[in-house]
């Protein structure tokens, strides 16, 4: 009996070793996350390893970048300093700026799922005093073809409530009926501020509460927090504007300015956390498959849909964020399985060199099967 047991154990060991060798031949090995615990699994893929460094190091990159294939990190590149004393890490968090809009869109669709909102609802149902509100739908706010526009406002002080922000929007936003009628697209962040105000109105909760409940708790995100959080729990980077002569100027926006970015750019996230969240929105894990398609899938020749642009050759979704010394980029397949995520805490004045490198890399990486 013992002889058979030993033989069986020996066969199992042989199978395990053989499987491990096959994995090595394929170039994929699991990486331990004991030092830098990330939201998604990391593996070493010899085919992809080094691509990010080769491309981004030429830009004097300061930040964190990851390549995703089959929902796993297959390459990463970290460079530069997060603060005056700390280096950037894979778990460092960065202000994601406009990359937050796709997340706000997800919060809107979550309320549609709950029956509290319809994409066809007119805005005057919630904010009757907003110019043009009786002509604009929730869907048009999401896709930025509402006919609304608003110049960038300057704020002082350390506090700004949602009610005060809404008053500023109502007093300063402009509605162009001809633009609305033509369906012309115009990038106007105020659309997402209005959506965020509507979310707070219909739920009785703050935007932050909705974000925490829908995303952070559900997906167990550990490296995600708001810019105005008093108790900073993540390895947060400072944002620097880099001048042509190389001088770095640390950015420190006042509290009112941070609060004015409601739903459009007030969240800090690590690159792995951000990928996990956006992929979970696109693949239906958070919203359901049908709702995710209805919200995000581009229609016809439309380039912008609920916070994401569309690249056609090859086909993938993307977004860019700039502000307060940060520059962020995401390029992701529609099913969320492949992605390029690049977060930097160096915003170089008058230079889009980092974006060009990200685009070049993404076209190759996302363009093959």
What are the language-model segments listed below?
Residues 59-61, 85-140, 178-187, 262-265, ...:
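Short active-site loop at a secondary-structure junction
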Residues 70-72, 84, 146-147, 231, ...:
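Solvent-exposed coil/turn segments that connect beta secondary-structure elements
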Residues 68-83, 159-168, 246:
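Short alpha-helical hairpin
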Residues 136-316, 320-322:
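Short, surface-exposed loop or secondary-structure junction motifs
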Residues 96, 100, 104, 191, ...:
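Hydrophobic (often cysteine-bearing) scaffold residues that line and stabilize catalytic clefts
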